[in-house]
Each structure stands twice: as structure tokens, then as C-alpha cells.
């Protein structure tokens, strides 16, 4: 098999739902990233085999294709959009790597985009053309069959109850996420990932959801989202707008084009779990991935596990025995945000910039009861 390597990765700063990016369609969120890669790597961009993007709540119509055309890329580049719900961005990266492995191509752009602020309203179609009732709006897409399809909040509560995760534990983890994200934004670690761009004439270069002044006392005052529950808006991620792009390339082609550093794709795993406990999807996914490579969690230097809810991250950490000092060391989605279709690609982007970590894992729990995970190693091409 051919060896895929990631030689470039960038994201925009993530906006809050209804925040500074609320007026921008997904294509506009991607455009500065496409332009950046075109400016920085014109030869690479002229040789692209495909663009593979994750997207979950967009307008449909193959957003990857439309976005690359809007950005002025060659019409000969096809484009494909992937929907594995919030695992879509990670799946896009995995699929690009698999395409390189198989020899189907040598250079791909992978990533994801989401605008929760611009997500279209969806209406149930009437059974009869003569139906006169008011239209029924879908609050969200169904993830599983009726009776086994909890809301995200219900699923997070299910995990908290099953694995005995207390309210205090969840609040503590959320506080940790904001503190680490704030620290690593200020020291320049997270800033490496972000491509600043102008929004209504002003530079946008910091994630809107990070709360550096957040306290445990403030978190403790928040009411549970469900009666007698433990999940709150404070120990959950926000809805966000954002975009991420990475360049995936065959190793020898990367050397030919002068690239000498990045991360190489080793393997991946995707596993189904009970939809009621979707948040612990990372557990079987990571276990399967490690078993395939004959590794243990002790062989992994850093793990990026998407923070949809504190409860599911804590449960997954405990079940996988991940040392806390290896988990989401720069903070996670509870602080920086969760633009669904882009989040998995953002995890890989973070690993790309953790240059002192050799062997790393990105993993996510996914709506409908799925976990996916990917293993990477630091790559030096010289």
C-alpha cells in the first residue's frame, strides 16, 4: 500500500451560533482556507485529485464541489461531501488517506465545514397534497429508529447514569477545557492552527466560545437541561460555525514536492454502539484500532477526543484508561466549539501541530451510535 501523509492543515477560528460568522454560508467559511492553500502551495493545488469534505446540516447539493468552484479552483477537480454526522470531518480525512493508500490518487484536500447559524429549516412533507395543517418543522435529523433515538442531551445523561459520572466531575472537566484552551490560545499553540481572516472589516482569529474567566462556581449555578439531570449548557459543547482543510498526499509525492514534515496516517477503525449511549463510541473504536496495530493506550502520546459533553469524554477516558495528561491537552470542543462536520478534521489539525508528540489518536462519538478513530505518527520526509 501507498503511505498517506498530511503535510498542511489549517482552520478558521470557530464562531458561536448566531455569532460573528452568522451571516456566512459554508462556502464562504471555506473560501479563505482554499485561498490560503492556493497562495502557499500553488503547485500542489494544481495537482489535486479530489476534495473530500464533511458536512452535516448544510443545504446539500454536494457542498464540497460547490465550495471549490466558489473558491476558484479548477473545474476538473470533482469534490465529494461526506455525512457521518459529527464524525464527518474525521471520516473525510480517513477517506482521503484510504484513497492514497489504494493508489487511486496522490493529492487530496480533506476537511469539513459547518454553519449552524445558516443551517436550513427542514419541514416534514405532507402525506396529502390537500393537507391543510400547519407545516411541521424538524428540530433535528433522526439518528436511529424510533424509541432508540435519544436527543444528544438525553444520550449524554444516559452515559452519565450508566457510568456514574457526577455533576461535579462534569463541571470540573468543562472548567479544565476552558482553562487549557485559554492558556494554549494565549501561548500560541492554538493560534498555529488558525488562519485569521477579515469578517466585516475586522480580523477574526480567536474561537468565540472560549471563556477564560469561567469559574467552577459559575458552572455550579447552571440548571440541568433535563429534570433531575446533571448535563448543563456549561458542561456541554456549544453549536458553532467553522471550517477546516488539510492536504493529504502520497509520501513519495510529498518528498518530490519538497515537503519534509507532517503526520502520517497509520490506520483507522469505525464501530457501531447502542444509539442510546452514542457518546462512548470512541471506546470500541479506539480499542479496535489499537488491537489492529498491536498497541496499547500506553503507546499513544496524545489523544484528541471530541468534547460534545463532559459525561461522554469522562466515560470514554475511564473505559480506555487514557491518562488525563494525554487527553485534549490544549482543551477541547466544550471550550473551542463543535461545528459538527468540521470537528473531526479539527482534531487531526490539532495533532498536526503537536509536533513533540510521536504517536497520536483522534476519535469521536457520533449520533446514531457510532465511534470512529484514526491513528497517526509524526513524519519526517528527509
UniProtKB/Swiss-Prot annotation:
GO terms under biological process: fatty acid beta-oxidation; phenylacetate catabolic process
InterPro entries, per database record: Thiolase, Thiolase-like, Thiolase-like_sf_Thiolase, Thiolase_C, Thiolase_CS, Thiolase_N
One GO molecular-function entry: acetyl-CoA C-acyltransferase activity
Coiled-coil stretches: none
Pfam families: Thiolase_C, Thiolase_N
Cysteine pairs bridged by disulfides in the record: none
The EC number(s) this enzyme carries: 2.3.1.-
One Gene Ontology cellular component: cytoplasm
Active site residues per record: 86, 338
Transmembrane segments: none
Top-level division of the source organism's lineage: Bacteria
This protein's UniProt keywords: Acyltransferase, Transferase
NCBIfam families named in the record: AcCoA-C-Actrans (TIGR01930)
PANTHER family per the UniProt record, alphabetical: 3-KETOACYL-COA THIOLASE, PEROXISOMAL (PTHR43853), ACETYL-COA C-ACETYLTRANSFERASE YHFS-RELATED (PTHR43853:SF3)
Membership in a protein family: Belongs to the thiolase-like superfamily. Thiolase family.
Name listed for the protein in its UniProt record: Putative acetyl-CoA C-acetyltransferase VraB
Annotated gene: vraB
